């Protein structure tokens, strides 16, 4: 942006206008811009005739202002113009003058014939034909041309101050800021053409070049005259006697500041686009100026606050005016490095804007700054908030008064509501504190359990497993076993505890697996023949369809054994290989849960070995082979210990004729892996591997003891449903504390002794008091 301080030495009132060389754009046609089009050949230059395309001619016709506008604007030029600025003839012998035979062409001059001559300003034999320029005209010249201009003007200042201020009569008086108190008649210098009004309104007066009061200036020469710094410096030089003879002419900067800091001036005017121009402050920027002496003090009239406000008024319109473009001619030259903002729409066209990419955030910020509004996301409806908001407790409730459309509460009612609200909040806080303590206690127990598992893992790995056969029956190992096996050694301990009495090898597993795959391929072909021939139930249960159906229902919450899960194929392979290994047993519903627990803790081949040996145990073999007589013996033995430990609940079950087979079959078939949480079922498996089948029935008694009070309040249907689907919030500590309270001795007889006596009684046909056997 150009400010008043950038005018400098080039803002003289009556400078001699020198021609400005036309720009020579690279890669384009050389062309001198007309007087109405820009600075290509200086003000008043005429483009030499040449051919132009239709588009350029249309633009020129549209953009060229009226002839009278230029005449009125340049009517102030009264000094000698250099060649190339007009067609007026020059004195013979002068450079650029036409030959003597040529007739004068004063009628062709763009400045018109109304120019006034001032003989007192004749210098160098030149006859001036035009009046002086205004302050704004000289501001369009580059700095170097201004300095040459002032050197040429130095010879034309001997005529005195009054002669230099002469103006043609018949012009309008210019009243800029600060002219309110001037004389109504004014001096001749206060008259100018109507087009000078915007220029004179700038009232540019260099602050450090003002004349003190009484130094030969009249009242009409103060703000309205708008003298430049160069003219005032020359006036001081004349008053002092002028420069010494023989001394070289001083530069504009030296005459302006007396050798101090050079004045700022216009320089390097560039054309960027239509109706726009650019001013590069390469020469006027203070960071490029050489160091100078102390600044020239301001006059006394402008040192106070009133002078500062006057300077602000005088300089306020200068920058605003020069941002407008009075020369809309498009120039063909390279784009300047410095980009300018688009100019004003002066002659009907708007300059093209540069296609600058703006992000949505910048556009939103500009819109908000322009409109004063901020964009906020649309608020959600209150109905949706009411559905989504669910307070965790009554502490989220806020006590509010009644709406304004309802009668106000009385004092007693308001106090009662406040008291009730405080009680509700207090109860809610107590409940939350209790729950927080409970969660904290559970976390402490979990951390303690993890620490115990970590310490036990070291003992199992370093001491017990290397000496398994020696230490497995020791009291220390049995106590560690009861507390639960560390997950890292659980699979290994299970394999050692179950053993491999069947001597199954991984190679044997691969053989049975390949047979199972062949059987699955031929299953679709032989299924119809098997149905007609009447195959056994075991063969039908070993079919692929039954295995697939049971696998999809194995631990459905884990989503690892279903189709597409990581262990689906492994589980399918183990079950299929076992049906080929034991066709007499085949596949029974519930085997998938046992195989799945083994897969989670062992490798595929080791899981198959443990699975086959585990199902080969007497109790599992009797249940999976559906040996009804053996199953009744296990139920009778269970009832003996049931009556011994839970006599009250035993009588309650007996009153409803609730036999053990209703709830024990599912527990024994799946080894509690389906009825209990998985981590609790694994701990049951740990002790089952240590104690054998006895612990399975002891665990059943522990579950009945845990829910004894609840079961005593239920009838037959609800008891059966409850025991089939146990609660999920059961904890290992509570369950194992109830299991530990079960005594597996009846009249100094242990489980094995009681089971043997039951079998003997059945063989002898003796009377048996078991409700299951009676039925």
Swiss-Prot record:
Residues 1-66, 94-312 are annotated as: Disordered. GO terms for cellular component: autophagosome; recycling endosome. Signal peptide: none annotated. Its main location: other. It comes from Homo sapiens (Human). GO terms for biological process: regulation of autophagosome assembly. InterPro entries: Rab-GAP-TBC_dom (IPR000195), Rab-GAP_TBC_sf (IPR035969), Rab_GAP_TBC_domain (IPR050302). Interacts with RAB11A; this interaction recruits TBC1D12 to RAB11A-positive recycling endosomes. Keywords: Acetylation, Coiled coil, Endosome, GTPase activation, Phosphoprotein. This is TBC1 domain family member 12. Gene3D superfamilies: putative rabgap domain of human tbc1 domain family member 14 like domains (1.10.8.270), Ypt/Rab-GAP domain of gyp1p, domain 1 (1.10.10.750), Ypt/Rab-GAP domain of gyp1p, domain 3 (1.10.472.80). The modification N-acetylmethionine is found at residue 1.
